[in-house]
Amino acid sequence: MKNLLVYVNPRNNFSNENWDNENDLLVKVQIDNSIELGWKPEDIMLVTNFPYEYSGVKSIEVGDENYCSFSCGTPTKINVILDLFDKGLIEDDIYWFHDFDAFQMEEFDVDLESNKIALTNYGITNISKGHNGRWSTGSVFFGNRTKDVFDLIKWAVYKYEKNEEVALLALTRHNKHKILDRIDRLNITYNFATRRRNIVEQHKITELPIKVIHFHPFDKRPVFYLREGQDNIGVCLHGKNPMDKPLVTERLAKTFKRHGIA
């Protein structure tokens, strides 16, 4: 399996208008965390549009044209994955793409056919039941025969000028090109997000222990249903949640602390 991280930015570095240079810390957390969990540096694919190297992981550089200028740039991941296909860098293996704020906590091995992608829904939100079933692309597994699936998603992204989650929802709602035959829905354990989620109810449907937790440690907004001040760090690292316990493992918490995130 390959561990895929993507960061393409018009500034050609790890800064952006929301988080300044904090993503430069997160990439180090991601690489250290992955190596601690047994990933070899050569199996960690960090794709950027600028040179970067850390702890034996050297970035694969792609062009600035992969950046998507709308929807906060999130469809960029689709463009980059397709670029990797075009460059012959997607080989006979399973690939795990995940956002910079989706952190693996346990070792896993996903059984997936080479012509399929696998991802979770949104879990149990405090937004609406309609959001619960929406696809979440923050953690996606895919095989080496899925280029046509990503081509379809890209087509829908640019047709509707919406992000890749909305595009995928549009495709699957009407099962265009029988796309549902190419998608496996995973348990929320592979993408346990916290903000705007009913953590207690979501935890009940999670295959424990949580394998991937999805939260941005630098997002200081209150988690939707909690009181002011109970942000992602408080909820996930310090147990300031209705379950009264941390959601991250002690090992991952130590990795965060080593990088000044606590």
What role is predicted for each listed range?
Residues L25-K28, P75-N79, K162-A170:
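A structural signal for well-ordered alpha-helical segments within the folded catalytic domains
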Residues D43-I44, Y95, I183:
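Hydrophobic/aromatic residues located in beta-strands of well-ordered beta-sheets
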Residues L46-E53, F100-F108, F218:
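Short, polar loop motifs at secondary-structure junctions
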Residues S59-E61, P75-N126, R134:
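GT-A fold catalytic core of metal-dependent nucleotide-sugar glycosyltransferases
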Residues V80, I117, S139-F141, R185, ...:
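Conserved hydrophobic/aromatic beta-strand scaffold that supports enzyme active sites
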Residues N144-T255, H259-G260:
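Catalytic core and acceptor-binding pocket of nucleotide-sugar-dependent glycosyltransferases
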